[in-house]
Amino acid sequence: MNHILLIILIFAALALIFGLLLGFAAIHFKVESDPIVDQLDALLPQTQCGQCGYPGCRPYAEAIANGDSINKCVPGGAQTIQNIADLMGVEPPSDDNELLMAPPKRVAFIHENLCIGCTKCIQACPVDAIIGAPKLMHTILRSECTGCDLCVDPCPTNCIEMIELPATPDRWKWDVETIPVRMVQ
């Protein structure tokens, strides 16, 4: 019985020593991150889609902080560009000099008759916009899909294609300056 108690005490002492060492290391060897990068990262949509040319939102936030253009986030859209411009204290790029023109909104579409239910697209989707179960057909939730195109390549049957969404009043780019509107007093 004494041996068991001794072993428990030794393990408790080791756990206490290692806990103190880890606590000391966490305090004294802490890596400080740039607060502007943290703020930029919080503004980005966190889809980790890679459409900006970076492997995720955090590396793109670091690139913006180092002077890269602020208009490469396609899923974030114009509102994200405006928020980043406000944070950085710069003017958002206008449509004429925009470095990366946002392509028309596209979403993934699964041809369900070709889907074998392998779940590779579900694993590749960064925003969980694909529902389905193994060995059953899968479906895309259009409202959740960001159009990142990451689900297309893993599909072994090529049953996923990117389709352009039709123009609707919700997504139409209204040019208010050319619409003849008269203010009624």
From Swiss-Prot:
One Gene Ontology biological process: electron transport chain
Start and end residues of each 4Fe-4S ferredoxin-type domain: 106-135, 136-165
Region (Hydrophobic): 1-26
Pfam families listed in its UniProt record: Fer4_21, FeS
Residues that coordinate or bind [4Fe-4S] cluster 3: 125, 145, 148, 151
Cofactor stoichiometry and binding remark: Binds 3 [4Fe-4S] clusters.
Binding site residues for [4Fe-4S] cluster 2: 115, 118, 121, 155
Binding site for [4Fe-4S] cluster 1: 49, 52, 57, 73
Primary localization: membrane
Record-annotated disulphide pairs: none
Cofactors that this protein relies on: [4Fe-4S] cluster
Alphabetized Gene3D superfamilies for the sequence: 3.30.70.20, Electron transport complex subunit B, putative Fe-S cluster (1.10.15.40)
Annotated GO MF terms: 4 iron, 4 sulfur cluster binding; electron transfer activity; metal ion binding
Keyword 4Fe-4S tagged: yes
Annotated localization: Cell inner membrane
InterPro entries (UniProt xref): 4Fe-4S_dom (IPR007202), 4Fe4S_Fe-S-bd (IPR017896), 4Fe4S_Fe_S_CS (IPR017900), Elect_transpt_cplx_RnfB/RsxB (IPR010207), RnfB/RsxB_Proteobac (IPR016463), RnfB_subfamily (IPR050294)
Segments forming domain 4Fe-4S: 32-90
EC number(s) given by UniProt: 7.-.-.-
GO cellular component: plasma membrane
Subunit structure: The complex is composed of six subunits: RnfA, RnfB, RnfC, RnfD, RnfE and RnfG.
Family, as annotated: Belongs to the 4Fe4S bacterial-type ferredoxin family. RnfB subfamily.
Function: Part of a membrane-bound complex that couples electron transfer with translocation of ions across the membrane.
HAMAP family linked: RsxB_RnfB (MF_00463)
Protein name: Ion-translocating oxidoreductase complex subunit B
